Amino acid sequence: RVADAYGAVLPTARMVYAIHKAPGVLHVGFKGFSPAKGETRDSTRLWLASNADIEKGLSGLGPWDPNRVVTDHKKDVVVGPTQVSRPSKVAIFGGWYPDGDIVQELNVKNHVIEYCDYSQCGRLVKPEVLIGGTLWPMHEVFLHPTYRFLLTGETGALTGQPRYGLKV
């Protein structure tokens, strides 16, 4: 709903990786935190500790520039073919440690759709991609049997849109 309200979409894992590798992005390395006994991974304490660490990392990058993308500090909730084939699961990908190692390869099996913890983020992207000089709506690219590969790394057309179901 938030993405829809802003006219945006969640990225695919392939897009998150491209953002990570793009020139000019600001890299704030991921730092993991463990819950205390009896605490869950979505606790306020873990979120605050993670946020403080991210703020510390940002302060070391010089003056704030709102035109630069900050990445690597969180795992992304992503979309892709999983949302069509496994609608009850949430796909998580990314986060990079300061040494460049990835935190989470694409995981499409282990987390129910309601899963949430301090280390995730919902990065929003514009719902258009430039292909051969033409702007394409992402929903059309997902359904295209050839161009879908650009977003997902997989060939063949989908039978539906990769998005998370709305629970009201």
Describe each model-derived feature in a short phrase.
Residues 3-4, 108, 152:
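Generic preference for well-ordered secondary structure
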